[in-house]
Amino acid sequence: MNSERSERITIPVLPLRDVVIYPHMVIPLFVGRQKSIKCIETSMSNDKKIMLIAQKEASKDEPTPKDLFDIGTISAILQMLKLPDGTVKVLIEGLQRAHIKNLTNNGEHFIAEVELISSSNLLDKNQEVLIRTTMNQFESYIKLNKKIPLEILNVLNNIKNSEKLADTIAAHMPLKLNDKQSVLEIRNINDRLEFLMAIMESEIDLLQVEKRIRHRVKKQMEKSQREYYLNEQIKAIQKELGDMDEIPDENKILKRKIKSSKMPKEAREKTELELQKLKMMSPMSAEATVVRSYIDWMIQVPWYLKTKIKKDLQQAKKILDIDHFGLETVKDRILEYLAVQSRKNKIKGPILCLIGPPGVGKTSLGKSIARSTGRKYVRIALGGIRDEAEIRGHRRTYIGSMPGKLIQKMAKAKVKNPLFLLDEIDKMSRDIRVDPASALLEVLDSEQNMNFNDHYLEVDYDLSDVMFVATSNSMNIPAPLLDRMEIIRLSGYTEDEKLNIAKRYLYPKQIERNGLEENEIKITDSAIISIIHYYTREAGVRSLEREISKICRKAVKNLILDKSLKHIEINSKNLKKFLGIKRFDYGKIHGTNQIGQVIGLAWTEVGGELLTIETTCVSGKGKLTYTGSLGEVMQESIQAALTVVRSQADRLGIKKDFHEKHDIHVHVPEGATPKDGPSAGAAMCTAIVSSLTNNPVKSNVAMTGEITLHGKILPIGGLKEKLLAAHRGGIKTVLIPYENKRNLEEIPKNIIEGLNIHPIKKIEEVLKLSLEKIPYV
C-alpha cells in the first residue's frame, strides 16, 4: 500500500457477494474466484491491507467497476489458508471506512485509490440518551428474534465507543444487502443509530405479529394433540375393559359401506379418496366433519337398488279407478307406459306434466301412479324456489353445504327408480339474476339425465330410471322446460263427477277425520248437489271438501251437546242450518232478458268462468269507453266488434251515423279483476247490437268466440272448461265457434246432453240465436 496524500491511499480491492464488512468486525471469508485469490496474494506480499467492497448484484462472477458500491471497508488479513480444492480461507478484521475515488483493473485484480472516512463524533448531551435507547430497542429485538444469542448484550454493554456499538449491532442483525450498505455509508453516528432504531422498530412489529401467529398455531396444535391423546387413552381404557371388541373401527365400517353401495367407478374412487383424507384428520376437527358428511351422503344415495315395477295392467287400472274418479286420459297414458314396460325391461321413464286448475287431483294422482306402478313416491314442492342450488346443490366450499333437493329426496327414497312429483312447477321464482327452471332442463331431458351432476357430490348421477311427474295450474312454464314434458290437461269436474267424488272419497274421509261413526251422520245426494250449486263455484273439489268438513264439525258439536241425539241427516232442506245462507245463485244469471247485457265464457287458471258484458248507448259525439280492467287484446276486440256493427248497420236497422251521435260504454263487472283475451269478440258485438237496437239478449244464452272485421267467428281455447262453467251456471244454450266442433268429443256426454250447443261460423248466426227478435231487416 503506497501513500499518496495524507487522506488517500492506493490499495487492492476484493469484491464480496452478499457480505458487508464493518470496522471492528472479525470474520472468516472463503474466496474462490481467481481474481480474488490474486488480490489476497498481492495483499499478503505487501502490508496485508485490503479494501473489501460489496457487489450490487451477487449473481455476477466477473463484476465491473459499475457493479461495485463506492464505499467499503479497509481491512487487515489476519490469517490465510489454502484449501485442497484450490480455494482460499482468510480471516479478516475490518479497520476503517473508505470511499473509492478511482477504481482500475490491472489485469489480475482491482486496484483503487481510496479516501479514508473519519466518523463524526456525537454531541455529549445526546450520546448517552441515544446509546441507551438503541440498547433498549436492540434488547427488545433479540428477545423476539431467537436467532441472536442474549450473550451479545454483555458484549455491547462493554463497548464505550458509539461508532463501534452501531457497527456491532448492525453486524448482528439479519439486514438486507442495501440496508447493510446504508449503515456503512452513513457517516454521522447519530444518523446511523437512528437508522438502526427505525429498522429495529419495523422488525419488532413484524416479529410480534409472527409471535402471535405462532402462539395461535401452537395452541391449536396442542388442542388437536390433546384431543388425539385423550381419544387414544379412551381407546386404550376401553380395550383393557374389553369394550373395544364391541366398537368396530369407523374407517373399516365406512370402507365396507362404500363397497356394498356398488357405486360407479368414478364415484367410488372419489369417495375412497375422501376416506383417505378422513383417516389423516383429527376426529374432532371441523374439516373432518365436512368430509364425513360428504362420505355419508355418497353412501346414502341409491346407486343400484331398484323397486320392481308392477306389470299387471288390470291391477294397475283397478288402483287408479279406486283412487280417482274420471281422469281417463291420464289413466290411459299410465297404462300405456306399463304395457310397454311389460314387453321391454329397459325403457326411459316418461316425463309427464299434469296441467289443470286447483283441486282437480293432480298431486294425489301422482301418489296413485306410484301405487299402480309399484314405485316409491317422492315429492318436491317447487313453489317459491328461487335458487339454482336448491336443485343442483351447494358446492362444498360453502359452510353448511348440502346436496340439492333431488339428491336429498333420492337418498330418502333409497331406490333409484321412484316416482318423482315436481309439484307446482309453474310457481318457481324467476328474475334476471336467478332461474332455477334452467337447472331442471338437464333433469327433465331423458337424453341427458343419466349424467346429472350435483354440485355437492361432484360426480354424475343417473336419473334415467326415475319417473318424473310435474304439476302446474297453467302453461306459464319456460318454453325449453315445457318442450321436455308430455302435457296432459286435467279440466274441471262435472256435477256428476263432483257428486261421485264427494260420496266415494271426501265424505268418508271427513267422517274419519272428525271422529264420527257412519251411523251417526248421513249427507244425502240432494244435500251434496245443493252444496255444489249454491255454496261452491270451482273447477276442483277443495271448496266442496271444506263445506263437507264444516258440516261434520257441526254435527259432532250437536251430538256432544244433545245426548238424546243419536243420528243426524243433512238434506237440501236443512242444509242452511249447517252452512248458512246460499253464496251463489245457480241457474239465475240475469233472471230476465236485458238490453245490452250478454253472458260470455272465459278461461282462467282455476277453470272456466261466466263473464257478464254490459253495453250502454247514450247521446254523444261518438266516444267509445271501456272499463273493467280490460287488457289490450280485449280492448281491440271491442274496436273490431264496433267496426263489424258499423259495416252491417243498414242490415241491422241502425242509422249509419250512429257512431257520430252516440257514445258507447262497454263494461265488464268486477272491475278490480284484470281481464284479457280475444274470445269475447262475439259477445262484445252482440252487446253493442242489443244496445243500439233496443233488442234484449236471452238470459239463458252464453257465447264464446273471436270475431274478425268481416264477422267471421274464429276458434278459441279452453272449450271444455268454458262448457263446464256454463253447465255449473245453469246456462241452457251455448254458442261456440264452428271450428271448435271437433273438440266436443272430449266433453263428457252428460255435459253435452245438458246443454244446447250451437257451432256458429258468422256473427249473423250469433245475433239470430241470442237476441229476442231477429235483428236483420
From Swiss-Prot:
SUPFAM superfamilies per UniProt: P-loop containing nucleoside triphosphate hydrolases, PUA domain-like, Ribosomal protein S5 domain 2-like
Gene3D superfamilies: 1.10.8.60, 1.20.5.5270, 1.20.58.1480, 3.30.230.10, LON domain-like, P-loop containing nucleotide triphosphate hydrolases
Residues involved in ATP binding: G356, P357, P358, G359, V360, G361, K362, T363
Domain of life: Bacteria
Active-site annotation: S679, K722
GO MF: ATP binding; ATP hydrolysis activity; ATP-dependent peptidase activity; sequence-specific DNA binding; serine-type endopeptidase activity
Induction cue: By heat shock.
The Lon proteolytic domain, residue ranges: 592-773
Keywords, alphabetical: ATP-binding, Cytoplasm, Hydrolase, Nucleotide-binding, Protease, Serine protease, Stress response
BP terms from Gene Ontology: cellular response to heat; protein quality control for misfolded or incompletely synthesized proteins
A GO CC term assigned to this protein in UniProt: cytoplasm
Subcellular location: Cytoplasm
Catalysed reactions listed for this entry: Hydrolysis of proteins in presence of ATP
Database matches in InterPro entries: AAA+_ATPase (IPR003593), ATPase_AAA_core (IPR003959), Lon_bac (IPR027543), Lon_bac/euk-typ (IPR004815), Lon_lid (IPR054594), Lon_proteolytic (IPR008269), Lon_Prtase (IPR027065), Lon_prtase_N (IPR003111)
SUBUNIT field: Homohexamer. Organized in a ring with a central cavity.
Known role: ATP-dependent serine protease that mediates the selective degradation of mutant and abnormal proteins as well as certain short-lived regulatory proteins. Required for cellular homeostasis and for survival from DNA damage and developmental changes induced by stress. Degrades polypeptides processively to yield small peptide fragments that are 5 to 10 amino acids long. Binds to DNA in a double-stranded, site-specific manner.
Family classification: Belongs to the peptidase S16 family.
Name the record gives this protein: Lon protease
Organism annotation: Buchnera aphidicola subsp. Acyrthosiphon pisum (strain APS) (Acyrthosiphon pisum symbiotic bacterium)
Lineage: Bacteria, Pseudomonadati, Pseudomonadota, Gammaproteobacteria, Enterobacterales
